[in-house]
UniProtKB/Swiss-Prot annotation:
It holds the Pfam family DUF1731. Belongs to the NAD(P)-dependent epimerase/dehydratase family. SDR39U1 subfamily. CDD domains: SDR_a8. It comes from the Bacteria. This is Epimerase family protein slr1223. Signal peptide: none annotated. NCBIfam families: yfcH.
């Protein structure tokens, strides 16, 4: 297949691209920095890959490369783990909403349109709660990230009017050793100073990065996948259980909680995502034949950390 990707140099994309290339697909990466893409994916090792510079929120010549592609994978968006100033919140919103709108605009202009578009979203769609359990049919929340996700998904759904199959993944907290939440939590645990963030009672709806990549890979060719799917493992845990399990796998204690105020100073409004959380279940995925490689947390952490 000829596949165009955004967000290819991010935490998920860095593992997705090698898999797709190994399968023999022709990959076009839309990136802000071609040099960064070439450092990550050396031309000698990735002969069927090309990187094209683009500004995600603006129309431009880059849109022409969408013509003739078989699939579009849209994972771009500013990281939400930075401190949320008002200016940065605008970047979080625009990079997702406008970035997706410009991709759909490019598809609309294409003479030969892709068969499928796979677009990221997040479980932040549901807002946060310590008591509710969310599935794909649950109503959206009303906080900032819920607003972002709704706008992001609404932009993606426009592609369906063009006859393109759309798969939206509401992605949970992605676990992998070299990035994301786990990489930030490992150092204090290894120094015997790990512990739960905040009260520890908040839900932590996670997914192993390998399972997320497998879901994206399946969505490329399985025409029965259509619509919205929660990309989370079937066994979410509370933060205190996550930290206890991480300590067990590392043979380290989980005894030193990080107080709310420290996270609020570090992340500002974004601390709410860590301190409140949500319990999200992959109801739609459970009705497919997809099999999780890491359905439970300890299995995932042991595979990731090699213990």
């Amino acid at each position: 297949m000829k596949i165009i990707l955004t967000g290819a140099t991010g935490f998920v994309g860095c593992s997705l691209v090698p898999l797709l290339h190994q399968q023999g697909h022709e990959l076009t990466l839309l990136v802000r920095s071609v040099s960064k893409a070439q450092r990550l994916f050396a031309p000698g090792s990735f002969p069927q890959l090309k990187a094209i510079a683009y500004e995600a929120t603006k129309s431009g010549d880059w849109q022409k490369v969408v013509d003739g592609q078989d699939a579009v994978i849209n994972l771009a968006g500013e990281p939400i783990s930075e401190r949320w100033t008002e200016a940065y919140k605008a970047e979080i919103f625009d990079s997702r909403k406008l970035g997706t709108e410009k991709l759909v605009e490019a598809i609309a202009k294409a003479d030969r349109k892709p068969q499928v578009m796979i677009s990221g979203s997040a479980i932040g769609y549901y807002g946060t709660s310590e008591t509710a359990t969310f599935t794909e049919s649950s109503k959206p929340g009303d906080d900032f990230l819920a607003e972002v996700c709704q706008a992001w998904e609404n932009a993606a759904h426009q592609v369906e009017q063009l006859g393109v199959r759309l798969v939206v993944f509401r992605i949970g907290i992605v676990l992998g050793a070299d990035g994301g939440a786990l990489a930030k939590m490992l150092p204090p645990f290894k120094l015997f100073a790990g512990g739960p963030l905040g009260s520890g009672e908040q839900w932590f709806s996670w997914i192993d990065r390998r399972d997320l990549i497998a879901l994206i890979d399946k969505a490329l060719t399985d025409s029965t996948l259509r619509g919205t799917y929660n990309a989370t493992a079937p066994n979410p845990v509370k933060m205190k259980e996550f930290c206890h399990t991480l300590g067990k796998v590392l043979a380290r204690p989980s005894w030193l909680p990080v107080p709310d105020i420290a996270l609020e100073l570090l992340l500002g409004e974004g601390a709410k995502l860590v301190l409140e959380g949500q319990e999200v279940l992959p109801g739609a995925i459970s009705k497919t034949d997809f099999q999780f490689q890491a359905p439970d947390l300890e299995t995932s952490l042991r595979q990731i950390l090699g213990s």
